[in-house]
Amino acid sequence: TKTTQITFDGEKNKIINGITDWVYEEEFGFVRAFEWNSASDKIAFIRFDETNVPEFSMDVYGKELYQTQTVFKYPKAGEANATVSLHIYDLQENKAKEVKVGKDYNDFYIPRIEWTNDADVLSAQFMNRHQNELDLWMIDASKNKSFIAIDEKDKAYIDVTDNLTFLKDDSFIWTSEKDGYNHIYHYDKKGKLINQITKGNWEVTNYYGFDAKNDKIFYQSVENGSINRDVYAIDLDGTNKTRLTKTNGTNNADFSADFSYFINSFSSATTPPKYTLNSAATGNVVKSIKDNDVLAKKLSDYKISQKEFSTIQVNGNDLNMWMIKPANFDATKEYPLFMFQYSGPGSQQVANRWNASNDYWYQMLVQKGYIIACVDGRGTGLKGAEFKKVTQKELGKYEVEDQIQAAKQLGALSYIDSSRIGIWGWSYGGFMSSNALFKGNDVFKMAIAVAPVTSWRFYDSIYTERYMTTPQENPSGYDDNSPINHVDKLKGDFLLIHGTGDDNVHVQNTMRMVEALIQADKQFEWMLYPDKNHSIYGGNTRLHLYLFLIHISEPTRPY
């Protein structure tokens, strides 16, 4: 074996070749930024020049006498991104060349590269900084020619996915929301539409791949209700659609290389995960791998209260909701209500799936006399592009309005004590719970915010600008929806929690909120977890966190 170095300019916090920078990894979901062609004689790679990206520094307290600092490049909204360029290294020529496509881009992203079956032709996705224009380029490395096969535009934004498969003739399968719902399409190699494969007022939630031998596509969708997920097969021409999973809940498939079988992981709100080997032709179970019956039996010994799924009409929309009531629920009594939500764009919390230990805390609270509820408001996913993208340029406006109104309506129920309604969330959910408590101070009496964004000005460029454009272009969208600017409205109990080692949502968010609360002469409680990241775990940390949350959430606690 022989090792050949093909790039020579790499330098920490300046130049990266072939792997992504922090923000690409976090928001575009990939790290390896190089790809071999099918003949193994060319490597395409992305080069990141992050010289001009501002540095973020984070104290690490550790166990030494002096703390240290972690310093890394982190482009916040509106700040300089890494400059990216596409290169192809030719093993025959022992030379790397920069790829120049036939269009000038200013401040852009290259979120995906993938070779076609033709060893000379590379596909590359180029996207503008606003992320509302996506070009799929076909680049012929031998002829130094390129053309755009697909140019998608959206009034809000376009999601980047891995849903691209090249067939033997280099026609390709692609997913898009262009008809209002996420669906599967088939294009010829020039980018001309052959047909739309899936259609309907429902979303394709996962594309598993293409079985070339049988001309079948396998995918997951919410055709059977937006809280459920099922696995389907469909012919390339859009005929012979077959539901392969038979049980309502969340089904997710992992297919064998030849698409003969798949391992199905199934769970529901009442059933812990079950793993089975299934036939891809029929969906029938071939073998049980793990049934979790022992766990299910053990859980049956506890007084577990089930989630009740329903919808609630709020601000003109039917919103998905679950509710958990005490086992000895008495409709003639009044119970305090504690609401959970996340609410981020395209997310879903009201789903028919097993949430394991994340739900055990709710069971403890229910046993202490709470009712727990969760409502997926506007901006959440799997109900079409319009429902999801209504929050564009106003993150936190419509989502908070929906949580406040839902709480009002639930508070009007005879068995809910409207004077004792609380809300909590983590990350985006903490941003939301803070805003809900401040803006809905006549509805919510307490809120918990864990690792919250408190101003989108503090968060990274790719995620934030996808939904908000830049602070320079949209200052009111950023500032009107920042809880920092509404601290004067605080009336109830407020708890802030953050890990000081959070490289994602920096503790700066909480520090700025704390300072604003102090200057507004508002009392509150807060907890910092030293050196813990966005997930706040390790050692006794997560147990400590939840025991603290239980203490804070005691129904007997005065509001």
Model-inferred region functions:
Residues 13-42, 70-85, 102-127, 133-138, ...:
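Conserved beta-propeller blade repeats
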Residues 41, 46, 195-197, 208-295:
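N-terminal targeting or regulatory segments adjacent to alpha/beta-hydrolase or S9 domains
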Residues 53-58, 83-85, 131-137, 180-185, ...:
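Structural motif
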